[in-house]
Amino acid sequence: MRYVVQTFIGAALIWALVACQSGPSQQFIQKVTAEQNDLKVSADQAKAAAEKAASLKKSLEDLKAELGKNWEKVEKDKDLSAQYQTLTQQIMDLEGQANTISSEVQAVLSGAQAFVDGLAQQKKKDEELDKEWGAIREKVSDAAGKLSELGEKLSTLEGEVGNFAETVKGKFAQAKK
């Protein structure tokens, strides 16, 4: 009988501790930590977008170097010169957007890291913390949407730069020889 009473009291104490637990559950902490790792993909995407913009810029610089003195002929051709200026401006704009979005993503990820680091000290319940975490996820989702849109613009611009390079090479590359 004594064993039954001790077991019952022990079980009641454990139940009371769990029921009165303050702070997030271990499952919530694990869920948030796993989701945070998923959010880090956005940082990689932002870096890739910035690198793609830089590679487009380099493509135009390489074209200019490849043509050498014949580049002057491109500059004198009103249509090609205007197209080059437009492409250069678009690349600079998208490069700026990539850097801005990258900064936004880094700021959100820093906030997510601070949230995760502070979870163990929190006294709030899962439901309250889930609202805060949801706001962080929403910011990352917004940035991911911007990154997707930027990726589409960069892909389109990549095609335009390729077409421009083909046109210029077709017109002026033979004259270099």
Segment roles from a protein language model:
Residues 1-21:
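Sec-dependent bacterial lipoprotein signal peptides
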Residues 3-5, 9, 39, 43-46, ...:
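Generic alpha-helix initiation/capping and coil-helix boundary signal
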Residues 11, 18, 61-62, 68, ...:
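Intrinsically disordered and other compositionally biased segments
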Residues 20-92:
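Immediate post-signal-peptide N-terminus of mature secreted/exported proteins
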Residues 32-52, 57, 118-177:
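C-terminal amphipathic alpha-helix
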Residues 57-60, 64-67, 109-116, 165:
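Extended amphipathic alpha-helical scaffold segments
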Residues 70-126, 130:
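Short, solvent-exposed, charged loop/turn and helix-capping segments
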